[in-house]
């Protein structure tokens, strides 16, 4: 799998069944111990995921926490998600994989994963095995009780982590409501709650982040979901950090990627990286459409 090779259809089915058994036991707020390296969107950029492991350390030597969006937009969604799920099955205590807004049946039919499965396997079975598995992915993680990690952001219907623990996550990502918000929301310069330009989730201001962190005894909300040119970006007076781990996103954005290392004492440091050198990849001119949900 490390050589960007595919499994056959039956192997994928078996892999997904095994992964379900493991993920079923995990919480909506999955507890994670430091040291751990926290990663943002990967989006099927397999060679850049290899670069991430080169920079951050191989699994299982390094503990990893991925905050979703493994598929769509990049050319190697199949190989990327297969590898991450295989690592989860092999080293369940060493890697945590959360759900992103792209780990959904609906979104993957628009942004590439469905078409890629069809192209590589000749039918939609592999897409079905993976999207069924996505329903089992934990929504959020909590590192040593202090750093709260999730794909998108906060929700007006959630005040405490216990509210999240009480959600039924075994379903397709809904169009609205708390589960949707956790995967779709974005921090914003404006205070309070706002309508999201994405058409799902909300924008939330610094007042919201500070209140949430204080109420839940947190020092930081770590999230992904937004392209940031340096690979990471602080906002809300360091109550929130955005981490994005797909360099030169969509093979055309020119951004750096980053990962956040948390040591034994929860001290953080960021490692930035550029795209892996590429050979023989098609040149992209097509503009990928932005969300129109």
Curated annotation (Swiss-Prot):
Cellular component, GO, one term: nucleus
Pfam families the UniProt entry points to: Metallophos (PF00149)
SUPFAM superfamilies registered for this protein in UniProt: Metallo-dependent phosphatases
InterPro entries in the cross-refs: Calcineurin-like_PHP_ApaH, Metallo-depent_PP-like, PPA2-like, Ser/Thr-sp_prot-phosphatase
Enzyme class: hydrolase
Post-translational modification: Reversibly methyl esterified on Leu-293 by leucine carboxyl methyltransferase 1 (Lcmt1) and protein phosphatase methylesterase 1 (PPME1). Carboxyl methylation influences the affinity of the catalytic subunit for the different regulatory subunits, thereby modulating the PP2A holoenzyme's substrate specificity, enzyme activity and cellular localization. Phosphorylation of either threonine (by autophosphorylation-activated protein kinase) or tyrosine results in inactivation of the phosphatase. Auto-dephosphorylation has been suggested as a mechanism for reactivation.
Modified residues annotated as Leucine methyl ester in this record: 293
Binding site for Mn(2+) 1: 41, 43, 69
Alphabetical keyword list: Centromere, Chromosome, Cytoplasm, Cytoskeleton, Hydrolase, Manganese, Metal-binding, Methylation, Nucleus, Phosphoprotein, Protein phosphatase, Ubl conjugation
Catalytic residues of the enzyme: 102
Positions where Phosphotyrosine occurs in the chain: 291
UniProt cofactor note: Binds 2 manganese ions per subunit.
Positions that bind Mn(2+) 2: 69, 101, 151, 225
One BP term from GO: mitotic cell cycle
EC number(s) per entry: 3.1.3.16
Listed PANTHER family: SERINE/THREONINE-PROTEIN PHOSPHATASE PP2A-RELATED
Family under the similarity heading: Belongs to the PPP phosphatase family. PP-1 subfamily.
Subunit description: Found in a complex with at least ARL2, PPP2CB, PPP2R1A, PPP2R2A, PPP2R5E and TBCD. Interacts with TBCD. PP2A consists of a common heterodimeric core enzyme (composed of a 36 kDa catalytic subunit (subunit C) and a 65 kDa constant regulatory subunit (PR65) (subunit A)) that associates with a variety of regulatory subunits. Proteins that associate with the core dimer include three families of regulatory subunits B (the R2/B/PR55/B55, R3/B''/PR72/PR130/PR59 and R5/B'/B56 families), the 48 kDa variable regulatory subunit, viral proteins, and cell signaling molecules. Binds PPME1.
Record-given protein name: Serine/threonine-protein phosphatase 2A catalytic subunit beta isoform
Species for this entry: Sus scrofa (Pig)
Higher taxonomy: Eukaryota, Metazoa, Chordata, Craniata, Vertebrata
Gene: PPP2CB
């Amino acid at each position: 799998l490390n050589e960007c090779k595919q499994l056959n259809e039956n192997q994928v089915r078996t892999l997904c069944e095994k992964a379900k058994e493991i993920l079923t036991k995990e919480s909506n707020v999955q507890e994670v111990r430091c040291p751990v390296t926290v990663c943002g969107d990967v989006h099927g950029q397999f060679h850049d995921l290899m670069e991430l492991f080169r920079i951050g350390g191989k699994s299982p030597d390094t503990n990893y926490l991925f905050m979703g969006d493994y598929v769509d937009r990049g050319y190697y969604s199949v190989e990327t998600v297969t590898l991450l799920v295989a690592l989860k099955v092999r080293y369940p205590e060493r890697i945590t994989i959360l759900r992103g807004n792209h780990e959904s049946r609906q979104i993957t039919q628009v942004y590439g994963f469905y078409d890629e499965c069809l192209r590589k396997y000749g039918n939609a079975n592999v897409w079905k095995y993976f999207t069924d598995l996505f329903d089992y992915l934990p929504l959020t993680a909590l590192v040593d009780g202090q750093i709260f990690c999730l794909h998108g952001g906060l929700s007006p219907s959630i005040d405490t982590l216990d509210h999240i623990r009480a959600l039924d996550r075994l379903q397709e990502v809904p169009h609205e409501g708390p589960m949707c918000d956790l995967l779709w929301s974005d921090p914003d310069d404006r205070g309070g709650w706002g309508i999201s330009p994405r058409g799902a989730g909300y924008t939330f201001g610094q007042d919201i982040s500070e209140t949430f962190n204080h109420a839940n005894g947190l020092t930081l909300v770590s999230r992904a979901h937004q392209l940031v040119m340096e690979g990471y970006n602080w906002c809300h007076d360091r109550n929130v950090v955005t981490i994005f781990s797909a360099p030169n996103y969509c093979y055309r954005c020119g951004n750096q990627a980053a990962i956040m290392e948390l040591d034994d004492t929860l001290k953080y440091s960021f490692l930035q990286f550029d795209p892996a050198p590429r050979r023989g990849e098609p040149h992209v001119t097509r503009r990928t459409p932005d969300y129109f949900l």
